[in-house]
Amino acid sequence: MRPNDRTASQIRPVTITRNFTCHAEGSVLIEFGNTKVLCNASVTEGVPRFMKGQGKGWVNAEYSMLPRATHTRSDREAARGKQGGRTLEIQRLIARSLRAALDLKLLGENTIVVDCDVIQADGGTRTASITGACVALVDALTWMRSKGIIKTNPMKHMIAAISVGIYKGNAIADLEYTEDSEAETDMNVVMTDTGKMIEVQGTAEGEPFSIEEMHEMLELAKHGIRELFDEQKAALN
């Protein structure tokens, strides 16, 4: 039995609000239950030095949590003078996932930076960030086309992500904090809307997991991500 009375495959209610702020070219507030993340996509001319002259664009991401996004206040990383290892890992995951969704040649020598700021955390912040960032990216690309910056839509796939895990011996989808903190296994899965995997990150926190359990978790992830694609499409329509 899950603490929230959800079934093993049941994801939390998802809300995607577009145009949440007025300045960013793409702005989305995404809510996975009590987890809330603001995803802003900003377009700038030019690319990082290592990309210059290649005729391709670039997508990067930054991730942070507000000091009181969690049960107790955490200092801002800026106050500590550097980003933590977890933050760096998550923003690289978000950026890699978004780049896999695009044909960078069609972006021209332009950069899109997606800022994912966690307003409230209750598990699954990185997967919510990826799912919301994808919608913000779509809106930023639409803006670029409307301004004549690009001629063709570079988006190859929609992408979405979900957490799955083993909790009290059972495979479950979309872990909230109380489940995540006690899970024997925690896995994050990023997929395209064509059913292909972009990234699978899985770690046994307690007991090692079997191949059969891994397959069960991946099936739950596929089922949950299909629902997330439906939510994205509904928001974009």
From Swiss-Prot:
Arranged from A to Z, the UniProt key words for this protein are: Nucleotidyltransferase, RNA-binding, rRNA processing, Transferase, tRNA processing, tRNA-binding
Which species does this protein come from? Answer: Pseudoalteromonas atlantica (strain T6c / ATCC BAA-1087)
Q: Does the keyword Transferase apply?
A: yes
Q: Does the keyword RNA-binding apply?
A: yes
Annotated GO molecular function terms are:
3'-5'-RNA exonuclease activity; tRNA binding; tRNA nucleotidyltransferase activity
Functional note: Phosphorolytic 3'-5' exoribonuclease that plays an important role in tRNA 3'-end maturation. Removes nucleotide residues following the 3'-CCA terminus of tRNAs; can also add nucleotides to the ends of RNA molecules by using nucleoside diphosphates as substrates, but this may not be physiologically important. Probably plays a role in initiation of 16S rRNA degradation (leading to ribosome degradation) during starvation.
Q: What superkingdom does the record give?
A: Bacteria
The entry's protein name is: Ribonuclease PH
User: What does the subunit section of this Swiss-Prot or TrEMBL entry state?
Assistant: Homohexameric ring arranged as a trimer of dimers.
